[in-house]
Amino acid sequence: MGNMKVYEALARQLRADSIRCSTIAGSGHPTSSLSAADLMAVLLAGHLRYDWSEPKNPANDHLIFSKGHASPLNYALFRAAGAITDQELMTFRKRGSRLEGHPTPVVPWVDVATGSLGQGLPIAVGIALAGKRVLGAPYHVWTLTGDSELAEGSIWEGLDHAGHERLANFTAIFDVNRLGQHGPTELEWNLDVYAARAKAFGCEPIVIDGHDVAAIDEALARARHADGPTVIVAKTVKGKGVSFLEDKEGWHGKALDEEQARRALAEIGDVPSRTFPTLKPDPWQPPKRPAPRMPEWKTYREPLATRKAYGEALAALGAARADVVVLDGEVSNSTHAEDFKKTAADRFFEMYIAEQQMVAAAVGMQVVGLIPFASTFAAFMTRAFDFVRMAAISRASIRLCGSHAGVSIGEDGPSQMALEDLAMMRAVHGSTVLYPCDANQTARLVGLMAEYGGISYLRTTREKTPILYTDRLEEFRVGGSRIVRGGAPDDAVAVVAAGITVHEAIKAADEVRGKIKVRVIDAYSVKPIDTVALVDAARATGGRLCVVEDHWIQGGLGDAVLAALAEAGVAREIERFVHLAVRDMPGSGKPAELLDAAGISARHIVNAVRELAGSGRGGHR
């Protein structure tokens, strides 16, 4: 048992500091911080094993504030541990401060950005999963979870997976303070229901009074030594420690003014400013991995689906690198991510039909130095978009693959067709968006993704596609493109395509060969796009451009091309621009039928090329 007086003193300091920093900021969530102060005081002073001077120590425990709005408490913890000064704490929410309104890894003791509720817990599951199955690490993963976010389905995806994997190194602490943003939460203080739900998902519930430091101490010790995942269900009071805030509605997200803060601090009592001793982890280093080597890529000669090439490239990576992990959403026999199991079965993670948890786990795994690839149908990746968005704020490096893109998937129909994914992924800050057209290109791009930081997205195709690139030494780069037809200074028309439509564009160019000189650009790097190649094509053809894509007309390749030309200052040089894209809701049919019905087949490209080649100065369509 720890020192109860130390816990109580630390809790008072955490409460006082949460109020002080938010009052000076003039905004923040002090009442949400006050409810969890006792929980975090006992964790910090008695159970968290963390070397604050070395945040990258691989043996450190991990603490994630899933209720990221309680950032005043998070930063008060850092101050109590001696990681930051009181002076820095008072810069909370100010321009240029590391202490942003919700935690981000700009602060070195923060693993991931939180603040979009329902995300911290499933990311913590990913960190725990990596620690157990890949690293064999001694760390424990703790996450502070608010009761309002327990309405999020992603929380239960996370607990389901924690239970399924028997993650004894994972503990969720439910701060059940009864009040949400504008009123009571769904279950208020019905702790039995929370406990029953946790148990149903395979986690051991521990129900406590969240303001009884002795009970908290005992619960945390029990969680540390449990043989499976634990959920501490703590009954707390929002605004605890300040009488005019306790269990009162209308205070969420409101800082106290100076007079209110003086009254509150007087109630909290004497708080000597101090740094509290904390536990350090025992020395530990992960087992040495073999040095990464160049993967042995296959060279394909016969038509092959890019989704199949993706799987075989993962297998090559798995043999060459011990830090690569692969996650899939129960469609690995379609995405072909299952091929990774041929070389690294112990680093393949079946995430089932839980796309949010899949992306969250990938974010968690990269926290501890792994290189995650996560795949599902591109249409279903949209379900995890907020996790991708937050991953960018986390400065995370994750690699996503969306298969079965566009109308070219055929008979399965529009529910399975990703027609929004390029727009979605282009919009993510700092993202890389790649769309290969053949198997050899796919393998090389997968290799690039393994080396590239940030969020990268690979769009793959269901149908087999012809092989265009057969040179074993062929190189591709992020931000590059290839001219696959034409390329002369007197080309009449340029057709820009990516993925499946590259082959339709080639058919069209071959059909008009000898009559119209067509330059076909394989824009495999949709973001960043090859602006130099586009400008050269625009000028060579007198500004006659056609973009063809298997995607809705909004937000995809066409918009990327126009934006690049506009930013390069050559938009006025465009004589005529034709954008062939999916405009009407598709149905079922053969891939070739659907490409034609959508107006993006070779036949439609031929018509566009002829129109462009014979056009005078005109507009856009």
Predicted regions and their residues:
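Alpha-helical transition-metal enzyme core signature, strongest for iron centers
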Residues: 148, 391, 546
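Residue-level marker for buried hydrophobic side chains located in beta-strands
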Residues: 143-144, 172-175, 401, 435, ...
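Active-site glycine- and acidic-residue-rich loops that bind
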Residues: 148-155, 210-217, 380, 436-443, ...
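A short helix-loop-beta submotif of the ANL/AMP-binding
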Residues: 147, 232, 371
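Thiamine diphosphate
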Residues: 1-142, 207, 262, 272-459, ...
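Conserved acidic functional residues
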Residues: 146-149, 352, 522
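Short beta-strand/turn micro-motifs composed of small residues
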Residues: 145-146, 174, 328, 376, ...
